[in-house]
């Protein structure tokens, strides 16, 4: 796997960064702000439909709804993001990152603080992103069960030094 320096990269943080005062849907739409502004021509006339804004806005809403369905939050679209349980907030943050259509999604400790059910839901989502959507994932994770379940290649670091590199099966067979 190689990635160009021009590739679109998205990132989620260990500490969830949502706009708590915005709705769940608005959190997904804000990720698509730049394409919407470009479609508007950066003018008020663009918002009125001149310059393709309305068509782009409809596409943004469809993409947001796709991700809301994928993370099972379509029925909470109008709820404030701050009112969601922690596991739902984590999945919403990942969906927001995916609304930017990244080639590579970097996740810092995505399973931190999740209970077993939430962790299983997260693993299912990340596996779907990797296999169905085709987005490469870069996981920074201490929970090796998460890494082994969703990864096709693992690099183990010890204070920045690579100590193991291979498939999950190879890493499990030789856990240095």
Residues of each region from the PLM?
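Glycine-rich phosphate-binding loops of nucleotide-dependent enzymes
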Residues: 1-176
């Amino acid at each position: 796997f190689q990635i160009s320096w021009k590739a679109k990269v998205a990132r989620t943080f260990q500490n969830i960064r949502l706009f708590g005062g915005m709705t769940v849907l608005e959190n997904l739409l804000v990720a698509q702000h730049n394409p919407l502004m470009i479609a508007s021509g950066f003018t008020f006339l663009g918002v009125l439909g001149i310059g393709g804004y309305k068509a782009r806005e409809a596409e943004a809403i469809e993409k947001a709804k796709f991700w809301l369905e994928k993370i099972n939050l379509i029925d909470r679209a109008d709820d404030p993001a701050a009112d969601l349980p922690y596991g739902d907030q984590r999945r919403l943050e990942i969906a927001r990152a995916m609304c930017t259509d990244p080639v590579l999604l970097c996740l810092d400790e995505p399973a931190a603080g999740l209970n077993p059910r939430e962790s299983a839901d997260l693993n299912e989502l990340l596996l779907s992103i990797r296999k169905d959507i085709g987005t490469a994932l870069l996981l920074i994770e201490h929970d090796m069960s998460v890494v082994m379940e969703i990864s096709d290649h693992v690099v183990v670091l010890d204070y920045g030094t690579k100590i193991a590199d291979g498939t999950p099966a190879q890493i499990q067979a030789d856990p240095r």
